[in-house]
């Protein structure tokens, strides 16, 4: 997968994946152990209930200790809309954590099936191509991990940087663990989507190699086309299963991220206009906004990347039509492959509401901006 991990980027990606695995085990959000005899994951009841109890205990401890009460009391007293927005966003974040951890417990069997299918694809179907380096896969994994670390640092800067916040070390530690556990959960879906993209990228590379061989008048075995057709069909089924498993997770993540971005911008406006806050303190909010948007956008970009890789397969297959293919069986296999690509695409359509891609991401940005304008007009006299 990582080209023998010979270069820095591949080694760093490998370390991040290992760190994600061990962190998920420690926090109980990946309740599986590896069975070396058959090379498959098996669900561990101990890890399953350990994760459920630990994460709900942390959430209960955070709520009881007022872990969501980050902010400036004077700003809340001056602007009730900001206070209500702040508490609503906090409640939404807690609700999202509760639901996602419950779904992680309830759907553990489905996640196990997904992970085992990915293991089969990685070490059996694509074993001969594991040494091929996929730069975008490595880059996206590294960026996601950096954004998660950035969110933790942003939280610490808000907890200790804003005047009026006085939190104990225990409360900050609990809140940080809750946030990190939440992000580890989402990281599993994110890596799964990137693996689907990587397999599609490998298939496209092999198809391009076959086109090149045909141009050089070299023979091409039609069974290879049928093999990649079968793999493409399995990836489509895997994508559908992954969407069905994680659609509620991603809906809550996108909703919570959207609300957090809006809260950061509105807090920045209120503190800048209504109160005489030091400029250094005001930098905390745009930094948090930048990191949060980056983290949210990476989840959208990963799905868009896989979708475009599926479209690229159809483009590569069209190259066969430009060649004089004399093998009837090869031509039939290519046509069948092209027909499948034309009718089935890698659209990550969640909850029957929207498809996660760049178009949806830009629509989210426009919606947030329009809603922010509405809130400013509604609460203009209090600013």
UniProtKB/Swiss-Prot annotation:
Protein name per the record: Putative gustatory receptor 22c
Family label: Belongs to the insect chemoreceptor superfamily. Gustatory receptor (GR) family. Gr22e subfamily.
GO CC list: axon; dendrite; membrane; neuronal cell body; plasma membrane
Regions crossing the membrane: 12-32, 46-66, 87-107, 145-165, 251-271, 280-300, 361-381
Membrane topology, Extracellular segments: 33-45, 108-144, 272-279, 382-383
Cytoplasmic side: 1-11, 67-86, 166-250, 301-360
UniProt xrefs under InterPro entries: 7TM_chemorcpt
Cited function: Probable gustatory receptor which mediates acceptance or avoidance behavior, depending on its substrates.
Lineage start: Eukaryota, Metazoa, Ecdysozoa, Arthropoda, Hexapoda
GO terms, biological process: monoatomic ion transmembrane transport; sensory perception of taste; signal transduction
Domain of life: Eukaryota
UniProt note on tissues of expression: Taste bristles in the foreleg and labial palps.
Membrane-related topology note: Multi-pass membrane protein
Keywords: Cell membrane, Glycoprotein, Membrane, Receptor, Transducer, Transmembrane, Transmembrane helix
């Amino acid at each position: 997968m990582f080209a023998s991990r010979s270069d820095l980027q591949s080694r760093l990606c490998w370390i991040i994946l290992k760190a994600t695995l061990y962190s998920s085990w420690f926090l109980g959000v990946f309740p599986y152990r590896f069975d070396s005899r058959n090379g498959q994951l098996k669900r561990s009841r101990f890890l399953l209930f350990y994760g459920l109890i630990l994460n709900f205990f942390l959430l209960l401890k955070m709520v009881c200790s007022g872990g969501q009460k980050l902010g400036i009391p004077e700003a809340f007293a001056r602007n009730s809309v900001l206070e209500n927005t702040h508490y609503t966003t906090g409640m939404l974040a807690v609700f999202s954590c509760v639901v996602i951890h419950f779904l992680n417990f309830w759907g553990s069997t489905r996640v196990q099936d997904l992970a085992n299918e990915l293991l089969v694809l990685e070490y059996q179907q694509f074993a001969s191509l594991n040494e091929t380096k996929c730069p975008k896969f490595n880059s996206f994994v590294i960026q996601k991990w950096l954004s998660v670390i950035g969110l933790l640092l942003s939280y610490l800067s808000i907890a200790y940087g804003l005047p009026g916040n006085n939190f104990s070390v225990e409360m900050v530690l609990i809140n940080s663990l809750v946030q990190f556990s939440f992000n580890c959960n989402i990281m599993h879906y994110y890596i799964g989507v990137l693996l689907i993209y990587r397999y599609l990228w490998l298939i496209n590379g092999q198809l391009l190699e076959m086109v090149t061989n045909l141009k050089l008048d070299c023979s091409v075995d039609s069974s290879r086309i049928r093999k990649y057709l079968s793999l493409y069909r399995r990836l489509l089924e895997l994508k559908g299963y992954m969407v069905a498993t994680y659609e509620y997770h991603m809906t809550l993540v996108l909703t919570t991220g959207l609300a957090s971005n809006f809260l950061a911008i509105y807090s920045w406006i209120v503190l800048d206009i209504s109160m005489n806050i030091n400029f250094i303190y005001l930098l905390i909010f745009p930094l948090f906004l930048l990191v949060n948007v980056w983290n949210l956008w990476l989840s959208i970009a990963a799905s868009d990347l896989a979708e475009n890789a599926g479209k690229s397969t159809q483009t590569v297959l069209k190259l066969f039509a430009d060649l004089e293919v004399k093998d009837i069986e090869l031509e039939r296999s290519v046509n069948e492959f092209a027909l499948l690509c034309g009718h089935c695409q890698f659209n990550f359509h969640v909850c029957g509401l929207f498809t996660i891609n760049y178009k949806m991401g830009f629509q989210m940005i426009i919606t947030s901006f329009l809603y922010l304008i509405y809130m400013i007009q509604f609460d203009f006299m209090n600013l």
